[in-house]
Amino acid sequence: MYKRQEKEFRFPLAYGNQRPPSASWTVTGSGACVLGKTRSRVKITGATTGKIIDYGLKDNQNMGACMAPAACDTIAQNLVDFNREPANYDRIVTGDLGVVGREILLELLKKKGYDISEQHSDCGMLIFDPAKQDTGAGGSGCGCAASVLAEYLLPKLENGEWKRILFVPTGALMSKVSFQEGSSRAVSYTHLTL
């Protein structure tokens, strides 16, 4: 699966290209959660739907920069919708912005008057150990956010270490054909408040 994803949306592994530091690695993980009526410590208390934001970026090796504006827009909208400050969350967790996208996100939110640097984590940065693994900007793909949510974030809510998180899985709408024709990569995602 990993090789297929790399071939479809980046470069075939056999091509041997050099990855730029902004590139991320496709996570071939998964996660599943079941919603039910039974009361538990973990619950969804609200949601803010994200929207497509297209800054016209065309670098398929820098997905974090492509997705950061959409993450910024939804986080800011959530804070307005629920009349909250970043400090009202134990963690604000994005899906797969990685190192580069995180820096852009923090800068964009500061321009809107929000500093989330203390609360922010990114699944793409949490899933790999950069000291032991050469993973560039971090992990990417829907498996990244899903596996970190299921195996790392939800247990912290369940055991009471955290009371409230803002989970913002990020994603890029990609077409290898339109990208090769010179179109930009648009971004869309949604999130859940837990």
Task: Identify the residue ranges that each predicted region occupies.
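Active-site-proximal alpha-helical scaffold in enzymes
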Residues: K3, K7, W25, A32-T38, ...
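Active-site-adjacent elements of ketosynthase-type condensing enzymes
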Residues: R4-Y15, G101-R102, V148, S175
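Long, repeat-rich segments with strong aromatic
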Residues: L79-P86, R91-L105
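Condensing-enzyme catalytic core mediating Claisen C-C bond formation in acyl metabolism
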Residues: F11-A76, D81-R84, Y114, E118-L126, ...
